[in-house]
UniProtKB/Swiss-Prot annotation:
It comes from Rhizobium meliloti (strain 1021). This is Protein ApaG. It holds the Pfam family DUF525. InterPro entries: ApaG_domain (IPR007474), ApaG_sf (IPR036767), Uncharacterised_ApaG (IPR023065). GO terms for biological process: error-free translesion synthesis. It comes from the Bacteria. NCBIfam families: PRK05461.1.
Length: 130
């Protein structure tokens, strides 16, 4: 698992390889990842947008951004956690992802919360990117 803490908002990521959706003979490798966002602060926060920076093993970069996650803009009160799963396809057997969520605190202040960098590695792959 990978973790980052920004302003008492903790983001935990657990990536996993989706063998049944991958086809290495066709250069298609797919990973899922589970994210848990925990609000350890004393303020309610709403996840407004997401940003992902995805790099495959050849150095090809893809940037993804948009409102919320999986169609939601969850509100996390103090002590709350929010969990979701999503996925990432690549044309190479490994890569790395990182990013941030833009949050809005009660009172209207906005700030970014780090999503830790995490490796996407096919089973049996010897090297890793981080």
């Amino acid at each position: 698992m990978y973790r980052a803490l920004t302003r008492d908002i903790e983001v935990t990521v657990e990536p996993y390889y989706l063998e049944e959706q991958s086809d290495p003979d066709d250069s298609r490798y797919v990973w899922g990842y589970r994210i848990i966002i925990a609000n350890h602060s004393g303020l309610a926060v709403r996840l407004m947008t997401r940003y992902w920076h995805i790099t495959d093993e050849n150095g090809q970069v893809d940037e993804v951004s948009g409102p919320g996650v999986i169609g939601e803009q969850p509100l996390l009160n103090p002590g709350d956690t929010y969990e979701y799963s999503s996925g990432c396809p690549l044309d190479t057997p490994s890569g790395v992802m990182f990013g941030h969520y833009s949050m809005e605190a009660e009172g209207g202040e906005t700030f970014d919360v780090a999503i830790p960098a995490f490796s996407l590695d096919s089973p049996g792959l010897v090297r890793t990117l981080n």
